[in-house]
Amino acid sequence: MSLVIQPLLMRALNPNLSSILISGRGFSLIQHRRFAFRAGSGNNNSEQNQVHINTAPIEFTANLLAGKNETEAETEGLKGTALKALRCNDTTSDSEPQHNMENLPFKVKLVDKGQRKQIKESKARVEPRPEVSLKKTYIEPYLQLSKPRLTVLVMLSAICSYALSPYPATVLQLLSLTVGTTLCSASANAINMGREPDFDRQMIRTQARPVVRGIVSPNQAFKFATAAGTLGTSILWLGVNPTVAFLGFSNIALYAWLYTSLKRKHIINTWVGALVGAIPPLMGWAASSPLSHPGAWCLAGLLYAWQFPHFNTLSHNIRNEYKNAGYVMTAWKNPKLNARVALRYSLLMFPLCFGLSYFNVTDWYYQLDSAFVNAWMSLWAFKFYFQQKRNYSKEIYNNKTEFNKGLAMANVYARRTFWVSVLHLPAVLILAILHKKDRWDWLFEDKKQLSA
C-alpha cells in the first residue's frame, strides 16, 4: 500500500518529483516487482536487483540525507516533512532541520518543545470545581421567594398594632410575634410564586422572581412555604396565643389560595387581597389585648383602606401587562372604577384616624397630624380620579389625540399617588405611636409634682 501512496504523495507535493520517481529508485523498484511477478519465484538476480526500502524512523532523516546529491536531498526532505505531518508525530528533536513547507497542499503549524510541554500539562491538569456560594445558591433565592419588602411591611404593621394596644408588652411576646408573622408572610408569598411562574414570566415586574428564572422549582417553593408556615404558626401558638396563630394561618390561606386563584377570574381579588393586609394589625393587637376593643378594628380598617390607593395606582401603570398575563384587574377592566375606588378609600382614612382618638388609642392631637398626611394622599388620588373621569367622557374618549394626552397625565398622577402612599402608611403609624394615649403623661406628672 505504501508503494502506491508514497509516489502519489510525492507527485502531489512537487511536480518535479515525478521524473525522479520514474527515472530513479522508483522506476527500478517497479521494474523489479514486475520481473518477480513474471518469474513466479525469487532467485539470486532478483535479490541483487532488489531496491532497499527505507524503514528508518523519521527522526533519523538528517542522517539518511547525508551523502546524497542536492536533488535527492530535497526530495527526501519533502517526503519526510509530509509523512511527519500525516503521522502527527510530535516526538521530534530540537536539532532537526526545518524544511521548506511552501509546496505542501495543507498548512502545518509547527509547535516547539516548550509549547508541547505546556499543552501536555494543561491536559493533565484537573481544573478545580467552582466554589458553591451559600449566599447566592440558598440565601438569596429563598429570601426573594419570601418577597422581603412586602414581608417587612406586614411585620411592621403587626408590631405597630402591638405597640398601640393598651395592655403591657413583653419582650418574649414581641419576639415571637415578629418571627412568627415574618415566617407566615414568607410562606404565603412563596406559595404565590410557586403557583404563578407561567404568568409572572409575562410581566416585566415579576420576571426576576426565582421560580420564573428556574433558580427555585415550584416544588422547592412549596416545601419552603410548608416549613416556614408550620414553624411560624407554631411560634405564634406557643410564644403568643392560639388566636394570633389562627390569624396567621388564615392569612396564608387567604393570600396563597383564595386571592391567587381569584386574580385570573374576577376583579374582586383586589378586595380579598386588602383583607390580607388588614389581618396583621389584628394579629399585633390580639397578642396582648382582646379583639373586642374597637381600636383593633380601626387599625385593621386603616390598613384595609390603604391597600386601594396603593395598589390601584400601581396596577394602572402596568395594566397592559396584567391584561396580557391573564390577570383580571380593575385597572384595565374598568379604569374609571379603579380611580374612583382609590379616591374613595383615601377619604376613608380621615374617619378611621378619628376613630383611633375617639376610642382612646391615641390622643386628640393625632387628628391634626394625621389630617395633613391623609390630605396629602387624598389630593393626588383626587387628581388621578378627576383626570380619568375626564379621559373617559364622550368628548375626550372619541378624540384620540386628546385621550392620549389625558391618559399620559393620568399616568403621572397615578405614579405620584403610588409614591405618596408608600410614605403615607409609615407616617400614619409612626404618628399614632407618638400620640398613643397617656404616652407623655409622665412629663406632665413631674411638672405637677414640682408645682405642688
From Swiss-Prot:
Pfam families tied to this protein: UbiA
Keyword Transcription attributed: no
GO biological process, one term: heme A biosynthetic process
Gene3D superfamilies documented for this protein: UbiA prenyltransferase
Cellular component per GO, a single term: mitochondrial membrane
Membrane topology: Multi-pass membrane protein
Gene Ontology MF terms: protoheme IX farnesyltransferase activity
Keyword Transferase tagged: yes
Domain of life, source organism: Eukaryota
Residues spanning the membrane: 152-172, 235-255, 267-287, 291-311, 341-361, 364-386, 417-437
Role, per record: Converts protoheme IX and farnesyl diphosphate to heme O.
Name assigned to this protein: Protoheme IX farnesyltransferase, mitochondrial
Organism: Kluyveromyces lactis (strain ATCC 8585 / CBS 2359 / DSM 70799 / NBRC 1267 / NRRL Y-1140 / WM37) (Yeast)
The gene coding this protein: COX10
